[in-house]
Amino acid sequence: MDTISENKCFGGTQGVYSHASAATGGTMTFGLFLPEEAANGPVPVLIYLSGLTCTHENAMTKSGAQAFAAEQGIALVFPDTSPRGDGVADTDGFDMGLAASFYVDATQDPWKPHYQMETYITRDLMQALADFPLDMDRVSITGHSMGGHGALTLALKHPDMFRSVSAFSPICHPTASDWGQRQFEGYLGSDKSVWADHDATLLMRSNGYDKPVLVDQGTADQFYDKLNTGDFAAACADARADAQIRLQSGYDHSYFFIASFIADHVDFHAQALYA
């Protein structure tokens, strides 16, 4: 583990760290906010997965989440959105390759050697976090857009790992979206039954979910037609999930939207983490 930076923030520390990952075959970077309570013992954890084109920095510097996490005594983790470095496959587009992993474990070349992001988040990152004063029995997850897709699918697939899940503007039904179909074929191959294991709507339909769910979606989101929020809401209703799906009038897909409602999400997770 290498320390890249540490800065005092809302009485705690905002750090940036790098570590070796067996899953991605390279060095990964993440941000970690530790509230001041961490000086006295382990604190609960909220992981934030960012969206397309992002790094670990975007939510760390734009969401304002640290202020509300400090009030609740919760740590925040900001992972990167893909592997990086020499030899890591990429495309010219913004929606596949670097910063566009869709948080899946790729099975197809040229992606397979490094794009093992589900394993990275659920194994390697968790192992790295064990070096810090964190209560790894109390972990929740959130995310935005592609990261919202990642948060929902990882929570649905690993229900014992996360106590609650939330998302801003998530890609809710990627197997039925331009944001998902091409990427899944590239990363996972042409077998659509494999795709279903990475689709929040289909996972909710098939498995249900017994932990709290919160989704915020802006009505002025310029990518609304790609996100299929209604499909996920219907799946939650059919599964009788403990889910709040909120449409926020006039809000778009930007970090201004996230900053407007991040306090609600931190409070939502605090209820589950301290239950």
Label for each model-derived stretch:
Residues M1-A275:
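Non-catalytic cap/lid and distal C-terminal segments of serine-dependent acyl enzymes
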